[in-house]
Amino acid sequence: MPDQKEAQRTFAARWFEEVWNKSRREAIDEMFPEEAVLHDGSAKYRGPAEFKLFYDALRAQLSDVRVTPLETISEGDMVCTRWSSTAKHSSTGKDLVVTGISILRFEDGRLVEAWQNWDQQGMLQQLEEPASKSFSQAAG
């Protein structure tokens, strides 16, 4: 039986692989429970239905998404993964590279809260958009 830290690290790796790399939208229902909250910058998504709004909007703008976990640290009830992602911007066809950090918090082995910060300004620069625009304004 894996210990708590190993189970949390395995969950994080599976999250990136199933949800993002394999585009298994149904994995969100399996892995992101109703009580879970994602904090993405100033936005907040509660439960799988709200998370899917974020996911679908992002996937509509990006194809060929590939997330590569670079480093993962597990301590107590939290896991932090530094990652790099590649994707193709659907409207322009430009290849993008984005880096970020995701922090996951667990209770009783279940994901309950997540925070992610990613280089939105770097993505906008790759799209050659003014930094004053948000990603959703530039990509839409």
Over which residues does each language-model region extend?
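Short, low-complexity N-terminal intrinsically disordered segments enriched in polar/charged residues
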Residues: 1-30, 34, 130-140
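A solvent-exposed, acidic/Ser-Thr-rich amphipathic alpha-helical stretch
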Residues: 5-7, 25-77
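Generic short beta-strand segments
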Residues: 35, 82-88
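Hydrophobic/aromatic beta-strand elements that line small-molecule binding cavities or substrate pockets
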Residues: 55, 67-73, 85, 99-104, ...
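Short, cysteine-centered beta-strand-loop-beta hairpins and adjacent loop/turn segments enriched
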Residues: 60, 64, 86-97
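Low-complexity, intrinsically disordered terminal/linker segments enriched in charged
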Residues: 113-140
